[in-house]
Amino acid sequence: MLKKTVLTLSFLSFITTFYGFNAQFTTSETDAAFLDGAIQDLQETPVENLLPAKDQFLISAYDGIIRTISVQEGNDWRLMSAIAYHESRFTADITSRRGARGLMQIMPSVARQFNVPQEEVLDPKTNVWLANKLLTKISSTLRLPAETSMRDRLSLVLASYNGGIGHVSDARRLARAHGENPNSWEVVARYLQLKAHPEYYENEVVKCGRFTGSGQTLAYVNDVLGRYDKYCRIAAR
């Protein structure tokens, strides 16, 4: 506990606000039991066993935790690290004014979706696990075709993580209704911006109404992907 506390206190205290995930997912009793077991397994592994020695850091002191859990969940740990940098500057014990918590700035609604008690969200392993589960759930819900480019796929998933999958899905439906590619980030980004205007958010295909956060969401996607590119150059998957 002392080692964990010292590591936590040594990080920079800087916070970026996490704008929540708008979609609501339900969890069956079977899934809930599975999630409880997975969380318990994570919590039984000492944090010290997942933290590398200081001279072994590639990206952050949480390389071990982020890498181990991301690999288990089938995600690129360098992408998850880029998200963590943007969200918290790798600060594990912070809570934003909006209630987002920890390394990945997890909102209370996300913890509830995955049956995680709020008092456990600040635990780094649980926090990173929740972020991985959320990204996997988003990717599955978007149902992007196999031929979608990796860049478009990552951009759409990140936009959903930041601005809400409901608004991204609206933008994709608008693109489709106007005869454009709903799987192109360039196209979807444009319709996210247009969803601030009545002639678009009042369209019958729109389910989540007006969206005024497109500027923040587009900047988020660009920032995270730019940092991800840098991390890919210094660390292997």
Residue ranges and their predicted role:
Residues 94-113, 177, 185:
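Short, surface-exposed glycine/acidic/tryptophan-bearing loops
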Residues 79, 102, 153-156:
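Amphipathic alpha-helical recognition patches that constitute DNA-binding helices
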Residues 63-64, 104-105, 109, 133:
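A generic alpha-helix surface/boundary motif
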Residues 87, 107-110, 165:
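Short, small-residue-rich loop/turn micro-motifs
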Residues 2-34, 73, 112, 116-126, ...:
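Non-catalytic cell-wall polysaccharide-engagement segments
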Residues 37-92, 125-128, 142-148, 236-237:
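Export/targeting segments at the very N-terminus of extracytoplasmic proteins
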Residues 82, 105, 157-160:
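Soluble periplasmic/extracytoplasmic beta-strand elements of cell-envelope proteins
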Residues 57, 98-101, 122, 215:
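Residues at secondary-structure transition points
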